Amino acid sequence: MDINRAIRVAVDTGNVVLGTKQAIKNIKHGEGQLVIVADNCAKDVREDIFYYTQLSETPVYTHQATSIELGAICGKPFPVSALLVLEPGNSAILNVNNEE
């Protein structure tokens, strides 16, 4: 599975929250099925995301792309350090952890 294509399909057809603040906020409320974090996400933010995902038992995938590249994958003209998949739409993005 091409992870970049799966992310783009999820953004286009599903319900995805972009950004670390919104992702953490939704994770705290127990929402979301998968968190994708950019490789260069700030250490303190990454620690917060991992802490809250452990509490909510939400899987996390660390993408090898930078935040600028992840933003481009999502079709956005700005960096995206983290995104939370609420609904995958037509994407197979939720299978990403099974292939690692």
Curated annotation (Swiss-Prot):
Keywords: Ribonucleoprotein, Ribosomal protein. GO terms for molecular function: RNA binding; structural constituent of ribosome. GO terms for biological process: translation. One of its GO terms (cellular component) is cytosolic large ribosomal subunit. It holds the Pfam family Ribosomal_L7Ae. SUPFAM superfamilies: L30e-like. It comes from the Archaea. Gene3D superfamilies: 3.30.1330.30. The keyword Ribosomal protein applies. Belongs to the eukaryotic ribosomal protein eL30 family. This is Large ribosomal subunit protein eL30. The gene is rpl30e.
